[in-house]
Amino acid sequence: MQYPTISEYVKASQDASDNLDMSTEATNAELNEAIMDEFGVKYSKDGRKLLKAPQNLDSTYSIKEGTKIICDMAFADCKSLRSLVVPDGVTSIGKRAFSDCTSLSSLVLPESVGNIIGNPFSGWDGELKCLSPYFIYDNKVLFDKDKSKIIAFRDKKTTSYVIPDYVTSIGNGAFYDCKSLRNIVIPDSVTSIGDSAFEGCTSLTSLVIPDSVTSIGDSAFDGCSSLTDIVLPDSVTSIGDCAFFLCESLISIVIPDSVTSIGDCAFDYCESLRSIVIPDSVTSIGDGAFDSCTSLTDIVLPDSVTSIGDWAFEGCGSLTNIAIPEGVTSIGDSAFSGCESLGSLVIPEGVTSIGDSAFRGCGSLSSLVLPESVGNIIGNPFSGWDGELKCLSPYFIYDNKVLFDKDKSKIIAFRDKKAKSYAIPDSITSIENGAFYDCKSLSSLVLPESVTCIGDYAFYDCKSLSSLVIPDGVTSIGTWAFMGCSSLSSLVIPDSVTRIGDSAFWGCGSLSSLVIHATGAGIVDSVFKGCKSLESLVLSDGVTSIGDSAFDGCSSLSSLVIPDSVTRIGDCAFSGCTSLTDIVIPDGVTSIGTWAFSGCTSLSSLVIPDSVADYVNWAFRGCSSLSNLVIRATGASIVDRAFKGCRSLCWLAIHAKIVIPDGVTSIGDDAFRGCKSLKSLVLPESVTSIGDKAFEGCSSLSSLVIPDSVTSIGNCAFGGCRSLKSLVIPDGVTSVGEDTFSVCSSLTNIAIPDSVTSIGDWAFSDCSSLRSLVIPDSVTRIGHCAFSGCSSLTNIAIPDSVTSIGFYAFSGCCSLSDIIIPDGVTHIEERAFYGCNFSNNLKQELISRFGIEIFW
C-alpha cells in the first residue's frame, strides 16, 4: 500500500476540515472559551482540540470522539493517570503532551495520527504501541515513516547508542531526560540537532558532532552536566539559545569560523569553562551568553563583534582580562556585572550606548573612562562599583562623584558612598534607575519640588536612609525604588503619584506608618512585602486592586480598611499578616487570590461578600483563629485548600454551623482540611463535586448531608472525620475513592448507592464503629485495604457483580465471622481476610478456592 507523505496527509486533513486551525498550541483565547468535561479536561469550544487536562486526573480517561488535536503539554504531569485511550480520529499530538505521566502503563497511537510535534513522551517510560503508518516504532525508538528523523528515544536504561546512518535529523526533545545515556554516536548523515534534543542527559560525557551538522537548536544540550568537552564542526553556522546551558562540567569548546551568532544564554552556567576563543565570523554576543561562567579567566573577542548583550558576562567572577573590540557600539545591561576579578577595562571610542548595571560589582576595577562617543546611558551602569570614573563625553557632567546628564535634569549615578546626607539640586526632575543604589551610609536626603520621577531601584538597599519626604510633584515611583531601605520609618505618598512599581518598598522593615494619598496608583505586587513594622495604613478611595504579595509578611499590621473601590485582592496579598485581627472585604471585590490571607493567625472573623466570583487555592489556609465565617458569595466555588488549617472554624454568625450558599458548585481539594472545630455543615443542592481531602481531619464534624446533586467525591475527602456518625452517598456518585472515609471511627452506617462501581483502596479503612454494610450490585472491585481495621463489622454482603478483592481488603475485621463470596469473584489478593474470625470450615472452603495467601 502506498501511503501519502506527512505533508500530503496534513494538507488533506486541512482541506477536509475546511482549513481549520491545525496548531498544537493551546492559546489563552482557547483556554478562556474552553468547555470542561466532568473530569476537568478542557476542550476547545468546537471540540476539535484537547487543550489541557488537570494534573490530578486520576485512574482511567478516554479522550472524546471527534478530537483531532492533543495540544502541547495536554497531559503533562498527570502523575495519577493510569490508563488513557486515544481514539482513532486524532491527527496531531503536540510536544510533551504526555510528559511525566509516571503512572501511565501503556499508550496506543492510533492509525489516524500523522503529525507529531517534538517528543510527546518525554519523562514517560510506559509501553508504547504505534498503529500509525506515518511512524515506525522500533526497539523503543520512534522514527518518522522514512526513518530519516528520530522523534523519541525511549530506552531510558541504555548507556550508549549509535544513531543509524539513515537518520538526517534529531528531532526536538528526541533524547530528552535520558539520564543513563553516557555515549552517543551521531552519523555523518545528520544535518540538524533539534531544540532540547539532548536536554537533561546528565550522564552524557562525550560527543562528536559530525561535519554534516549545520545547526544546533535551542537548549540542545541544556543540563548535560557531565559533558566535559565538545568540538563544533566547520559546518555549524549558529549556536541556539541556551544550547549548552548548565553544562557544569564543560571545560573547553571549540567554536569554528563558520559560526556567525551565539544565542542568548548559550553557555550560561557553564561553571567549569576556563577559556574560549570566539572566531572572527561572530558579530554579536547574545544576552547571557556566558552568564555565570565562574571559572572563565580569559576570553578573546574578535574585531567583528559590534555588540555585547545584556548579562553577557555577568557573574564571571574569575575573568581577569577582556579587550572590548574597537567595533563595539553597545554594551548591554549587566554585561560585566559581578566580574569581581576584572582588573582593567577599556571602553573603546565608538561605543555609543552603555546599559544599566553594566559594571556593577566589578570590585577589582580601579578606574574607567567614558569616551566621547557615549551618548546614551541606561540607568546606572556603575551601581555597586566604587572605582575612579573619568567622563570625556560631552553628553554628561561628572561633578563631585555625581553623574548627571548634560542639562543636570537627571541624576544618573550618585557615587559618594561615604556621604551621609545629600540635597538633590533644584534642577533635577528625574532620579534615574539605580541612581543611589547601595548607598549604605546615606541617612538623610532632600528631594526638591522639581522631581517628578523616581526610577526603578533608585534607592535600593540604602539601609541607613531613615527619613524622606516625597514632594507633591512626583508622579511615578519605580519598581524596587526603596527596596531594602530597612531604616525608613515613615512615609507619605502624595496624591500626585499615579504609578507605584512592583516591590517598591519591599523589605522596609522599620516602616511603621504609611499614608497613601495616591488614588490612581493601585497597590501593586509585593509593594510593601516584608514591612514587618507596619502597624497602620490608610488607603485612599480610588484604589481598585491589591496586588500579589502586596502586604506579605507585614506581621505588625493589625487593622486595615480596604476602600469600596477595590475589586481584586491578589495572591498572597496579606499572607503572614499574623497581627491582623479583622478585615472587612468590601462588596465590590470579585476575586480573592491564592494564599491571599494564608497564615493570618490572629484573624478571627470574616465576611466574604456575594460579589466574590472566585477565591482560589489556599486563600485562608492556616487562619488558625478564624472562628466566624460568613460566605455570601453564591457564584463561587469553595476551591482547593481555601480554608485548610482553620482549626478554630466552627460557626457562622448566629448559627452553630457553616452555611455554604446556593450557587456554589464545587468544594475544592483541601478546602476545609484540618478545620478541627468544624462541627456541622450544610451543602447546597448546587454543589456537584467534593475535592480530594476537602474535609480531611475535620475531627469534630458530626453532621453532614451530601446533596443529591453531587456526582464526584474525591480521595480522602472525609478522611479522619472521627465524629461523623452516618452518611448517605447520593445516587450520582460512581466511585468511592482512595481513603475517602478512612479513620471515620464513629461512622456506624453508610448507604452506598447503585451508581457506585468501585470501592477504592483504603476507602473505609479503620472505620472501627461500622457494623454492617450493603455493597450494591453495581460494584465490580473492592480495593486494597478497603475495609481494613473495621473491627466492629459483623455483616457484609458481597454482590455477584464483584470480580476482584484487593490485598488486606478486610484485614483486622475481627468481628467478621461469616461471609459469602459469589462465584463471580475470580481473584482475591494476599491477606484480604487476615485477622477475620472465620470458622475453620469457612477458611478451608475459601483456601480451596483462592489459596492460603488470602489469610496470611
Regions found by a protein language model. Name each.
Residues C71-A74, G94-A97, N119, I151, ...:
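Consensus positions within tandem repeat domains that build extended binding/scaffold surfaces
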Residues M1-K42, R48, A53-I69, C78-S92, ...:
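Structural signature of tandem-repeat unit edges
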